[in-house]
Amino acid sequence: MPKLRVTQIASVAGRKPGQKETLIGLGLNKIGRTRVLEDTPSIRGMTRKVAHLIQVEETNEAE
């Protein structure tokens, strides 16, 4: 199954609480942190919600 490499590129300071919670749900809490996640509809929805705070790349690598 394809995977997504998600990297936080901006701070959550001054953002809505829901955006901070979404980043925590993605496993991100500091700028520069990267996670490799399964490409599922729920993960895609979460990445769209905070697209201005993260960088997303499609990949096939294992964790």
From Swiss-Prot:
Q: Which domain of life is it from?
A: Bacteria
Which residues are the signal sequence here? none
A Pfam family name for this chain?
Ribosomal_L30
The terms under GO molecular function for this entry are:
structural constituent of ribosome
Name the keywords, alphabetized.
Answer: Ribonucleoprotein, Ribosomal protein
**Looking at the UniProt record for this protein, which Gene Ontology cellular component terms does it annotate, in alphabetical order?**
cytosolic large ribosomal subunit
**One GO-annotated biological process of the protein:** translation
Show the InterPro entries listed in the entry. Answer: Ribo_uL30_ferredoxin-like_sf, Ribosomal_uL30_bac-type, Ribosomal_uL30_ferredoxin-like
> NCBIfam families, per this entry?
rpmD_bact
Q: What quaternary arrangement does the UniProt entry report?
A: Part of the 50S ribosomal subunit.
What protein family does this chain belong to?
A: Belongs to the universal ribosomal protein uL30 family.
UniProt protein name: Large ribosomal subunit protein uL30
Species of the source: Granulibacter bethesdensis (strain ATCC BAA-1260 / CGDNIH1)
The top of its lineage is: Bacteria, Pseudomonadati, Pseudomonadota, Alphaproteobacteria, Acetobacterales
As recorded in Swiss-Prot or TrEMBL, the protein's gene is named rpmD
